[in-house]
Amino acid sequence: MRIYQITELPNPQMNVIIHPSYFPSISHFLAIAKADVVTFEMEDNFQKQTNRNRVYIYSPNGIQLLNVPVKHSKEAHQRTKDVKLETAFDWQKQHFKSLEAAYRTSPFFEYFEDDIRPVFQKKHTFLMDLNLETMSIISKCLRLEFDYNETTEYFHKITDKKDFRNLINGKKDTAVFEPYTQVFGEKHGYLNNLSILDLLFNEGRYALEYLKKQQL
């Protein structure tokens, strides 16, 4: 996997730690855009009902949750990097159909469609590999380049990095951002901090500039 390196660093020496997630929220990519170096948390235990395997998009009926099905282990504590994807049904096809229904009429869906579609056709074994690939794809689409490393041990408290790991819990991810035009905004109003896909399909190449103007 290749993730591109930022050429303009808004805050040199800023190192953030964050969870890889499935087409992450806008706040996730804002944290990355503000960073000099990104550290991905690889040693955490998997928790249900978090954004490790779910994403929120703006559908014709309002906010919609897309959940990535995983195989649950009998072990009390299973590391996220060891979690395997459920392959009993074609959830990838369902997810892409949902994205088409939500964003086919957006300004930039067709522009990025060929970049996004392949990940829904590829069969991954592990959730972590899927998450990292979706982040790599989005980084390329945004032209957002950054250096990154991975943890080799879990620490509850981090003192040498800006800790954004709480963003993986959607209930604690309460950041509010400047509104931008959304496909169904006139029908349902502005929906804040959805998947980065929502920003990408609506703002296109301007999405990175939008991120740089926001505060987290």
Q: Across the structure, where does each feature detected by a protein language model lie?
A:
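Residues lining hydrophobic/aromatic ligand-binding pockets adjacent to catalytic sites
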Residues: R2-L216
